[in-house]
Design a protein with these regions (language model features):
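Non-catalytic scaffold segments within catalytic domains of secreted glycoside hydrolases
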Residues: 1-111
């Protein structure tokens, strides 16, 4: 739930009001390998919440979880969190739709 991220940001800012905040490893696993519209919606919703919080708090960075599909300690290779698909047999990388969305968002919002 995106509002949970806002709640966490507000909680941390109460304990460290003068410290810059960085959101790290925010993302979700998606069942679809390349076409991951659910992940794009997840990022849109969560970034909207981060933008609202940044109006009043010193949020300095946001990092997606993760660039590449990888080995997760608790889940092994079963869940894919990356915005780049990795074929574990061949190591071939393929940009997912979420990668392309991030790319267009960064270009669109660059100063």
């Amino acid at each position: 739930e995106p509002s949970g991220l806002t709640d966490a940001i507000n909680l941390v800012s109460r304990y460290a009001p003068d410290k810059p905040l960085y959101i790290t490893e925010n993302g979700m696993a998606s069942a679809n390998t390349i076409t991951d519209k659910d992940r794009i919606e997840y990022y849109k919703d969560h970034l909207h919440e981060v933008a609202k919080a940044a109006r009043n708090l010193p949020i300095k960075g946001y990092f997606a979880w993760s660039l590449l599909d990888n080995f997760e300690w608790a889940l092994g290779y079963k869940k894919r969190f990356g915005i780049v698909h990795v074929d574990y047999k061949t190591q071939q990388r393929t940009k997912k739709d979420s990668f392309k969305w991030w790319q267009s968002e960064l270009v669109r919002t660059s100063p």
